């Protein structure tokens, strides 16, 4: 009786209360820090680190985000001049290039390049037979070069054929333009002020870079040129300002930038030196594929992909061998119970029932059922309230997590009640090992063939070894100190019912109705198994799951199916709960019952709650199109229904109009609704000389066709803008902009042709001269022998039609785009306005070349 009482009060025994309490503590101890790391930004230091001025950085961010500053805005020019002024004020104490001073001998040379000369013509490359989009862009980038101690002292850029000498340098880049509907605090204002602080840091005595450092302030990133598409809605809206961020967020990025850049400029290895594999790229070495993961926000574990491949191959071979050898040893020492139905008694031939297969199949069955429920919940949310994850991602997580745990606990307890088995845990780890080994095989193949490192990279789970270990080398699993089956009580030949009395078994230390021999098993190994498996899964999978939902929870407003998000949540729920499953049948009813109530509450909330709020707004896309030929003025909002209609109904100018909606947008579930809106004043308020200009004079264009050839020259210019484009009803074969530079690494067109040419200039009201040529229509063809006449065959096949369009993107001044002002004023608070295209207003003239 004494031993039974001692076992009962064992704080790490494999009994309900220790299992419930310890498992809960372990999970909370791991999940809470992961949540805090992902949700709470580290505090900025109270005092400025050496070479950094946080107060100055915050003031810079406030100034930068004082207005919308897209490339096609006057405010963008102001930001450009302000950046030059800030850069010069920072480097003023340093040595001027070519004028060394004895007082500043320990400071690096700094060179500032205001790029107002370069331009580039390129295209998006096209897909299949789809026509591509060509772009002509004139740079207004700012380049700051900090000479490294290993760099050559020659100003090689001053020579026409000059080339840099020494080892490779480091490039850090940020764009200083914003979208036309956002102030650009996070996209990419924090990046810009981080570059300014990097400049201050590396021009501070004692922080000189070993390698040359180039800080690139680029312009025009938001307007197609680099195609940034942020995962969060607010980065393209008016909430992307300093009111909705803080100095802690600024320090978070700045500290990472300083640490990373300092490591790069101080690197002494040769990995980034030498010729590149691609001759069209800068000679920066061949590099290697890397693998890394975060350790509680304090450090990165970094190693090469081939190292992961080698470890994976070793685990694939060693892990099964270890399991096999362990199984052989257990069998040889008469201690192997897994997969054993019975044992023969020595000398009698009678069979002793061991019930060794009991519990073998319950693990995959229960896991499949428990995993199916979150998938069904994902489908239910997609059908009933698909956008609830937009604002309530943790409610979705709570629903799926609680549903999985309760159902798995209920099924495991039911199976354990009807068919109790001491080997439930051993078989669970065995199945987990098999599944992990298979996933590791897949991961290893992808790492080797595709260069992809994803999925499980370990194959632990020793399976039966921990479960079947006996306290001593001489003690049998079956009973007492016997080493053979010779003295065991025999059973009936056909069967297998044990005749031990339950009272004796309980006194011997078995748990309820499990096999009588189980009292000899160690009671503490489950703690080691939990501590081995849970941290690995929760640290790696937990952070990945939170990152995934944070980046994808608002993709529904972009027209992407949210079922992908819910399905990912359901899969990650299973992965996060896997360490619990071998132990879950020992849980008391308290936590599963509580989680069942959580499931009911979150399910109801997720099905009926309104998915958007002022803090988590629905993104809609605005554009106003003016046809200068017929004077029509169309305002369009693109978004998801029925919320888009609710927003439009609140706009006064749309009241009483016939709102037309269609699904012709390329954005999946999005609809575009249009109505006749307020007329824009794109020439600007207060420009008296332009007030009387008719809208049809906003754009001037001229077309000159080469006689007898499918060639033409188009001249186009717009008032108060520096962005226009040409759209063609069918693709042109080639184009060239007067004065443009072509880089063979980025061809302006391909055999598919160009259906649209976008033109960007650093000069306001610039006139672009574009030469185009096109092929005859492919329609004339194979139907010439048809009996019926098609009048289209008689039409000239070398006609080219299209539109000359100019764009206006400056929404800083009220009254310039009244339709946009109206939408911002009257749309519900849970609606956010973003741009639908490069311009907020697009005016067009149609043309035909024949």
Swiss-Prot record:
Subcellular location field: Vacuole membrane
Active site residues of this protein: 221
Q: What's a BP term from Gene Ontology annotated to this protein?
A: proteolysis
Topological domains annotated Vacuolar? 42-282, 330-363, 415-425, 551-563, 612-850
User: According to the record, how does the cofactor bind?
Assistant: Binds 2 Zn(2+) ions per subunit.
Gene3D superfamilies recorded: Zn peptidases
Please list the residues that bind Zn(2+) 2.
187, 222
What are the TM regions of this chain, as residue ranges? Answer: 21-41, 283-303, 309-329, 364-384, 394-414, 426-446, 530-550, 564-584, 591-611
For the keyword Zinc-finger, the answer is: no
For this chain, the family text in UniProt reads: Belongs to the peptidase M28 family.
What is the name attached to this protein's record? Vacuolar membrane protease
């Amino acid at each position: 009786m004494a031993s039974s009482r001692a076992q009962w009060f064992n704080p790490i025994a494999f009994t309900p209360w220790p299992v419930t309490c310890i498992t809960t503590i372990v999970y909370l101890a791991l999940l809470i820090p992961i949540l805090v790391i992902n949700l709470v930004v580290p505090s900025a230091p109270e005092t400025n680190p050496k070479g950094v001025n946080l107060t100055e950085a915050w003031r810079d961010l406030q100034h930068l985000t004082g207005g919308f500053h897209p490339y096609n805005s006057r405010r963008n020019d102001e930001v450009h001049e302000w950046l030059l002024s800030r850069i010069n004020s920072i480097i003023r104490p340093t040595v001027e290039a070519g004028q060394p001073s004895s007082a500043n001998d320990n400071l690096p040379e700094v060179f500032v390049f205001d790029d107002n000369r370069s331009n580039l013509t390129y295209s998006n490359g096209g897909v299949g037979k789809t026509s591509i989009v060509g772009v002509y862009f004139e740079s207004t980038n700012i380049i700051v070069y900090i000479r490294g101690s290993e760099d050559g002292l020659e100003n090689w850029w001053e020579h026409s054929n000059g080339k840099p000498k020494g080892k490779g340098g480091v490039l850090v880049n940020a764009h200083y333009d914003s979208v036309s509907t956002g102030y650009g605090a996070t996209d990419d204002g924090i990046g810009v002020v981080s570059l300014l602080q990097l400049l201050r840091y590396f021009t501070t005595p004692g922080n000189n870079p070993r390698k040359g450092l180039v800080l690139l302030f680029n312009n025009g990133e938001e307007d197609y040129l680099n195609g940034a598409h942020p995962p969060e809605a607010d980065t393209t809206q008016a909430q992307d300002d300093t009111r909705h961020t803080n100095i802690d967020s600024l320090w978070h990025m700045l500290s990472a930038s300083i640490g990373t850049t300092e490591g790069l400029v101080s690197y002494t290895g040769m990995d980034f030196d030498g010729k590149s594999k691609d001759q069209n790229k800068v000679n920066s070495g061949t590099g290697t594929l890397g693998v890394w993961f975060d350790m509680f926000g304090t450090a990165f574990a970094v190693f090469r992909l081939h190292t992961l491949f080698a470890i994976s191959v070793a685990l694939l071979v060693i892990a099964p061998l270890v399991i096999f050898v362990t199984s052989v040893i257990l069998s040889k020492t008469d201690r192997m119970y897994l997969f054993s139905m019975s044992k023969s008694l020595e000398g009698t031939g009678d069979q002793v029932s061991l019930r060794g297969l009991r519990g073998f199949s319950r693990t995959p069955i229960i896991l499949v059922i428990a995993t199916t429920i979150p998938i069904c919940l994902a489908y239910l949310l997609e059908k009933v309230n698909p956008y609830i994850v937009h604002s309530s991602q943790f409610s979705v997580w709570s629903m799926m997590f609680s549903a999985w745990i309760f159902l798995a606990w209920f099924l495991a307890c039911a199976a354990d009640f009807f068919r109790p088995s001491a080997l439930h845990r051993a078989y669970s780890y065995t199945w987990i090992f098999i599944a992990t080994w298979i996933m590791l095989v897949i991961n290893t193949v992808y790492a080797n063939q595709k260069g992809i490192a994803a999925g499980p990279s370990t194959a632990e789970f020793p399976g039966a070894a921990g479960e079947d270990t006996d306290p001593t080398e001489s003690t049998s699993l079956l009973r007492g100190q016997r080493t053979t089956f010779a003295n065991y009580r025999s059973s009936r030949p056909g069967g297998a019912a044990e005749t031990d009395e339950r009272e004796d078994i309980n006194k011997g230390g078995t748990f309820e109705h499990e096999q009588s021999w189980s009292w000899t098993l160690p009671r503490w190994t489950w703690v080691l198994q939990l501590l081995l498996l849970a941290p690995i899964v929760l640290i790696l999978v937990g952070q990945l799951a939170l990152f995934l939902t944070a980046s994808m929870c608002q993709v529904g407003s972009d027209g992407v199916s949210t079922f992908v998000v819910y399905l990912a949540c359901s899969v990650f729920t299973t992965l996060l709960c896997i360490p619990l499953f071998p132990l879950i049948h020992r849980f008391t009813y308290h936590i599963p019952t509580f989680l069942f109530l959580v499931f009911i509450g979150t399910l109801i909330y997720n099905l009926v709650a309104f998915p958007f709020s002022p803090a988590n707004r629905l993104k809609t896309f605005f554009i106003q199109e003016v046809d200068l030929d017929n004077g029509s003025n169309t305002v369009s909002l693109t978004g998801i229904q029925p919320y888009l209609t609710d927003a439009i109904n609140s706009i006064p100018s749309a009241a009483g109009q016939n709102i037309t909606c269609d699904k012709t947008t390329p954005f999946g579930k999005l609809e575009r609704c249009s109505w006749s809106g307020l007329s824009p004043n794109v020439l600007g308020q207060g420009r008296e000389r332009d007030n009387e200009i008719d809208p049809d004079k906003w754009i001037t264009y001229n077309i000159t066709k080469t006689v007898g050839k499918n060639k033409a020259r188009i001249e186009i210019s717009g008032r108060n803008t520096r962005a226009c484009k040409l759209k063609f009803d069918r693709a042109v074969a080639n184009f060239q902009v007067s004065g443009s530079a072509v880089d063979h690494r980025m061809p302006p067109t391909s055999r598919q042709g160009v259906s649209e040419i976008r033109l960007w200039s650093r000069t306001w009201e610039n006139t672009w001269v574009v030469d185009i040529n096109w092929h005859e229509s492919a329609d004339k063809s194979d139907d010439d022998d048809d009996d019926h006449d098609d009048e289209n065959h008689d039409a000239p096949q070398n006609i080219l039609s299209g539109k000359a369009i100019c764009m206006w993107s400056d929404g800083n001044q009220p009254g310039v785009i009244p339709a946009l002002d109206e939408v911002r004023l009257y749309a519900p608070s849970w609606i956010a306005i973003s741009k639908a295209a490069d311009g907020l207003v697009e005016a067009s003239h149609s043309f035909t070349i024949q």
